[in-house]
Amino acid sequence: MRQAIVTLKKGEGRLLKSGGAWIFDNEIDSIMGEFENGDIVIVHDFDGYGMGRGFINMNSKIRIRMMTRKQDQEIDHAFLEMRVRDAWEYRKKTVDTSSCRVIFGEADFLPGLVIDKFSDVLVVESLALGIDRMKEEIVDILKAVLSEDGITIRGVYERSDAKVRQNEDMERVKGFIGEEFDTKVEIVENGVRYMVDVKDGQKTGFFLDQKYNRLAIQRLCKDAEVLDCFTHTGSFALNAGIAGAKRVTGVDASELGIEQARENARLNGLEDRVEFVCADVFDLLPKLEEEGKQYDVVILDPPAFTKSRKTIKNATKGYREINMRGMKLVKPGGYLATCSCSHFMDYELFTKTIHQAAQNVHKRIRQVEYRTQAPDHPILWSAEESYYLKFYVFQIVDEK
């Protein structure tokens, strides 16, 4: 079947020409030929120069997501297998693959698709109409590729229930792909055991992007008193505990998260040294300050305070406040680990916000290290949306 041809306006497609994968609604001059939303189309520059192929959705502001820059490349089974194999080979070289993100959307040149592997379970998240049509074929390819390395997948669960699907005029979907199975799976990361609930946990069930950041805080936590804020299912707290922390307190507002965190503590035999409190962090930290509590290590891993540029001002206030509160609770010479998972809170703004927080509470901070997301969430420099996690470790220093 002949594919429709989309021609860009003169001077448009700047993101595309710099290596990006998105074409927005206001960049298109004309469309020649018939198509349905989700179809693969051919993209031309204003002068007829071939830019590649991608899938189109007229209901989305992101009109086209590019699949290839090669004008004559067919988007078929062989193409998808090539993409999946490339993604898996990259993970085998860069991360512990027992649990990892196998497909990371645009950064793996499969725009809109996320696939996480938790031991022998796959979790799929589809965020774009075109890739949604291909997801089951891609899953079958991935299972076959994994089997070549002796890995058998016992089940696949879909977590395409994010609100962002509504931007593509797609329903939110959650459920089994294929046969039903027990959706709780045990994984081991950095020597810590977790029970992951892929059905009812946040996002795909567990935040794999912080894998090596969790490992990085272990060396700071031996014999330390640690406060882990926004603990979710206890991952940073448990890394502190397994590293030999004297006492760890994990805080989160989610009762389900705290329940799972306590289960994970029991799983690791850490319930005597790692406790979890269900509370709003913004309410609890001022109370701890009033009580004169201080810790050797404070960890701040908040959810994204903003998911759009429109709310960045309020989000900045939130990040500033939480870092001010956190710094006040660190003993002199102690450590603050702080991060932001919002793409819109970029590196420069996050750094500036922490600096302002330190000035506001009259704290001198010494940078220990700066980190980003784990390599299984690769940052593609031509796709700025792939760079979202910023992670700092600081020492709170007093001049003696």
Describe each model-derived feature in a short phrase.
Residues M1-S119:
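Non-catalytic accessory regions of SAM-dependent methyltransferases
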Residues G105-D116, K135-F207:
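Non-catalytic substrate-recognition/targeting regions of SAM-dependent transferases
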Residues D223-H232:
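Conserved class I S-adenosyl-L-methionine
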Residues T233-K246:
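Conserved SAM-binding loop of SAM-dependent methyltransferases across substrates and taxa
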Residues R247-D252:
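Conserved SAM-binding motif I beta-strand of class I
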Residues L256-I299:
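S-adenosyl-L-methionine
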Residues V281-Q359, R371:
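S-adenosylmethionine
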Residues Y335-K400:
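C-terminal catalytic and target-recognition region of SAM-dependent MTase-like enzymes
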